[in-house]
Amino acid sequence: MTIRALVVDDSALIRKVLSDILNEDPKIRVVGTAVNGKDGLEKVIKLRPDVVLLDNVMPVLDGLKTLARIMKEQPTPVVIVSALGERAEEITLTAFEYGAVDVIEKPSGILSQSMPEMAEEICRKVRTAPKANLKNLECMRDSEPLNPEKRETKENRVLKKAAPRNILAIGASTGGPRALEKLICSLPAELPAAVLVVQHMPPGFTASLSKRLDSKSALRVKEAQEGDRVEDGTVLIAPGNYHMEIVRNKVNSLEEETIHLSCGPKELGSRPSVNVLFRSIASVYGSRVISLVLTGMNCDGADGAEEIKKMGGKVIAEARSSCVVYGMPGEIVRRNLADLVLPLDKMAEEIIRIIG
C-alpha cells in the first residue's frame, strides 16, 4: 500500500527537495505540501495523510503547537524535520514529548555529496512512521529537572566512581528518546552498573538528548567521547554518526575500560549501530552484561544480542504493548534471544532486581 505523505515547511526549497526525495520512492506519494503550521493542520484534517513531515521552526503556528494540535485533533504519525543548532535540537527533543515519532535532519542542499544517503534515511523513516503505535505516543511532560541540591550531590558522586560491576547496554531507534527518558529516570542514583546507550539519531541531536536526560535523571548522563572511562552510575550515549565500542587498557598495571568511537561502515543502515556496541561489550564483559532492546525499526541489535547470549549475558526485549515500533525487539523475540520480554514501565524494577 502506498504511504501518503504531507510535507509542512515554510521554505519552498525544502518542500521541493523533500517532495522530490519522497516521490522517488515507489512506496511513498506526497499528497500535499503546506507553508506553515496553520496551513499544515488544515491539510492534515482535509487530506488525512499517513505521515506528516513537519518543520520544527515556522511562522504563524510553530512546529510544537502544530504537533500538539495534530495529536489532539487528528492523531497522525509525525516526523520532525530539523536544522542543526542547539535551539532547533532542543525544540526537536521537546517534540518527542508531544508525540513525534522520529526526526530527520533538514537537507542542506541538493548537490550535497551526502544527499543520496540522506534521501535513503528520510524514505526509510517515512516508511516506518505509519507503523507507529500512536497510543504509546501520548504527551509525556511529567519528568522535571533535578533541583540544585540533587544535582550537586550527583556531581560529587561522580568523583568517586569505580570500574563497573555490571554493564547495562541499551539499543533503541524510533520512539527511543521517550523510552530512554522513562527508563533512565526510573533508575536509582547508586546503580551498581555502567549504562551504555545507542539511540539512532542524526549527529548533534544526541548531545542535546544527553543534556536533557542528565537534567532529569539521578544518574550522570553524557554524550560519549573518545577515551571516556566506563564507570558505575554513569550513562554514556553514542554520538550520532559514530559507532561506540569498549576497549580494555592497562593503566599503572591496572586494567580499565574506555570508550572507542569510530566512523566505520554503517551496519543495517545505522551508525551508531546497536550490533557494534553489543558485540563489543559481549567480548569485554561476558556474563556481566544486561542488554535491553527497546522500540525501534529494523532488526539492529539482534546479531549483537546473540553474541551476548553466547557469553552468558542477559537479553531483555521491550514488549509490543509499550513499543512505538516493534521492529527491533520483535526480531529479538522472533529469534528466541530474549530472556525476558517486559513492558517499559517494568524494566527498571527488573534491572534493579537482577543487579541486586
Swiss-Prot record:
It is found in: Cytoplasm. GO terms for molecular function: phosphorelay response regulator activity; protein-glutamate methylesterase activity; protein-glutamine glutaminase activity. Phosphorylated by CheA. Phosphorylation of the N-terminal regulatory domain activates the methylesterase activity. GO terms for biological process: chemotaxis. Residues 4-121 form the Response regulatory domain. Keywords: Chemotaxis, Cytoplasm, Hydrolase, Phosphoprotein. The keyword Cell inner membrane does not apply. Pfam families: CheB_methylest (PF01339), Response_reg (PF00072). The keyword Hydrolase applies. InterPro entries: CheB-like, CheB_C, CheY-like_superfamily, Sig_transdc_resp-reg_Me-estase, Sig_transdc_resp-reg_receiver. It is an enzyme of class 3 (hydrolase). Its EC number is 3.1.1.61, 3.5.1.44. Residues 161-356 form the CheB-type methylesterase domain. The modification 4-aspartylphosphate is found at residue 55. The active site is at residues 173, 200, 300. It catalyses: [protein]-L-glutamate 5-O-methyl ester + H2O = L-glutamyl-[protein] + methanol + H(+); L-glutaminyl-[protein] + H2O = L-glutamyl-[protein] + NH4(+). Gene3D superfamilies: 3.40.50.2300, Methylesterase CheB, C-terminal domain (3.40.50.180). One of its GO terms (cellular component) is cytoplasm. Belongs to the CheB family. Contains a C-terminal catalytic domain, and an N-terminal region which modulates catalytic activity. Involved in chemotaxis. Part of a chemotaxis signal transduction system that modulates chemotaxis in response to various stimuli. Catalyzes the demethylation of specific methylglutamate residues introduced into the chemoreceptors (methyl-accepting chemotaxis proteins or MCP) by CheR. Also mediates the irreversible deamidation of specific glutamine residues to glutamic acid. This is Protein-glutamate methylesterase/protein-glutamine glutaminase 2. It comes from Methanosarcina acetivorans (strain ATCC 35395 / DSM 2834 / JCM 12185 / C2A).
